[in-house]
Design a protein with these regions (language model features):
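PLP-dependent amino-acid enzyme catalytic core
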Residues: 1-496
Length: 496
């Protein structure tokens, strides 16, 4: 299968391994299939397949340059003993909603689903393409991607990981995870600014030809672990298919019944994977885009205008503290019938003016497939408390955003289609907020201390990923200005 840029010519294509290695297109666009694949499965098959089988099926569908053996071994390595639940994605039913738990991997967040797989794909892609250079994984993070990419690529030969995150813009647990990851090829550096500042600078560095020439001369090549990388996005399609199959298997729904998914959304990768699952034939009625107070996407889906010219909020759901959602570009490419000129024009408007408006036809398509809402910080805490009071089920702040917006949507529309909440992180990643929500009083601790405090309140057994946090001492945090990121990379790699 061939891949093209959302902003480039249909004739300028790459193979899947090339797209995975390159990460971001040279014109600033994102890689998408030249022809979206036809499903290689029947809907009734999904209830009979394990998560690993569905993951292998999806990867072989989108990345057919890899052999069956390469995909099988990649899946086995990605979804092995590092997961604390053998099913990989357990589904819990609470208060008439289904919670798709994506946080049972080593770093306690949904990013593990893709970032345990991406290093496997990257290794095999490098072998296929016979790349002699070391791969530099350059990534901006709002918290979870940094941790998960560092864990996934730790000590991988021929690969270095450089992560930039916003100072004060990640949770204490996320910070400790990044600063205590073990591996001699890992770096995490704070920038003075927010996630959008980090991501914007990363994109600029990716497209700086003179800097890339210096890298090449020193034996290095950039790639990315953000969901901008198609190798990171595709594995996420699997859990939508798996969840639907499990609901059929458990007789919660009948084969062919429609399902809604409420997705806590920041950079738009997770919900885009759901849209791709729908394009493959999964009976999804609505994808509900759930935002925190950085509600640029809520406004976009409700009025067709994307406008980043607004106050940036640091919230208790920090992984969603984003005003520029990169993967939305892939959706626009699809809804504009793969018109790369329209997409490039919209992205230029966003860069130059800070806003754009989609056509009436595209807005109609948005309304057909999506709904949107947001939750304030107080509503997040109230939702955690409400869900806990119902049957002692504990959710993290991001999942609470999804749950709150799902309920808001159902009350507004009366739509009683079965609802799946995409549960994106363990509550122990954000113990301060969860503790305050459940007890009504502030946590007296932060980080690991707050985990102990929350565990004392909740009881039960801590997962492997949570217990690992108690054993590691973090490195000293390094903080730089965003415009010094390129200089920092040069220093780390000792570029001549």
């Amino acid at each position: 299968m061939q891949y093209r840029s959302t902003r480039g010519s249909k004739e300028n294509t790459l193979t899947a391994p090339q797209a995975i290695i390159q990460g971001l297109a040279q014109d600033g666009g994102l890689y998408v299939p030249v022809a979206f694949p036809q499903a290689n499965f029947k809907l009734e098959d999904l209830s009979k397949l394990s998560y690993k089988q569905i993951a292998a099926m999806v990867i072989s569908l989108f990345f057919d340059d890899f052999t069956k053996e390469q995909i099988t071994t990649a899946v086995q390595s990605a979804y092995s003993e590092q997961w604390d639940d053998r099913s990989i994605v357990p589904i819990e039913k609470h208060d008439n909603h289904f919670y798709m738990e994506l946080f049972h991997g080593p770093t306690l967040a949904f990013k593990d689903i893709a970032l345990q797989m991406l290093p496997q794909l990257m290794t095999r892609a490098v072998q296929i393409e016979k790349i002699a250079k070391d791969i530099i994984i350059l990534t901006a993070t709002s918290g979870d991607t940094g941790t998960a990419s560092m864990r996934g690529f730790a000590n991988q030969k021929g690969t270095d990981v450089i992560v930039f995150y916003p100072e004060g813009g990640v949770s204490p647990v996320q910070l400790k995870q990044m600063l205590s990851q073990r591996g001699n090829n890992l770096r995490a550096i704070a920038i003075k600014g927010n996630f959008d500042d980090a991501q914007t600078e990363v994109k600029k560095i990716f497209n700086d030809d003179s800097f890339k020439n210096r890298l090449n001369a020193n034996g290095y090549q950039f790639s990315s672990a953000n969901s901008m990388n198609i190798g990171r996005l595709v594995p996420q399609i699997s859990y939508y298919l798996y969840t639907y199959g499990q609901l059929v298997r458990r007789q919660e729904i009948k084969l062919g019944d429609e399902v809604n998914f409420a997705v806590p959304t920041g950079n738009f990768g997770d919900i885009l994977a759901g849209y791709y699952a729908k394009k493959l034939g999964l009976p999804i009625k609505k994808l509900i885009c759930a935002s925190n107070e950085n509600n640029v996407l809520t406004d976009f889906f409700n009025n067709g205008v994307y406008d980043k010219r607004r106050k940036f909020h640091l919230t208790n759901a920090p992984a969603m503290d984003i005003l520029v959602s990169s993967n939305l570009e892939r959706l626009l490419f699809d809804l504009y019938d793969e018109n790369n000129y329209e997409v490039a024009s919209l992205m230029n408007q966003l860069t130059q003016r800070g806003h754009y408006q989609v056509s009436g036809e595209v807005f109609t398509k948005l309304q057909k497939n999506f709904a949107a809402g947001f939750a304030t910080e107080e509503e997040v805490k109230s939702e955690i408390k409400r869900v806990y009071n119902y049957d002692r089920y504990v959710i993290d702040p991001h999942t609470a955003v999804g749950s709150f917006v799902a309920n808001q949507y159902q009350k507004k529309t009366g739509d009683q289609t079965p609802m799946v909440i995409v549960s994106t992180a363990s509550p122990y990643k954000f113990p301060e907020t969860v503790y305050e929500a459940i007890t009504g009083g502030p946590s007296m601790q932060t980080g690991v201390g707050a985990i102990k405090e929350l565990h004392d309140e909740l009881g039960g057994q801590l997962s492997i990923g949570v217990r690992a946090l108690f054993d590691r001492e973090p490195k000293t945090e390094k903080i730089i200005e965003p415009n010094d990121m390129e200089k920092e990379i040069s220093s780390i790699l000792d570029l001549k």
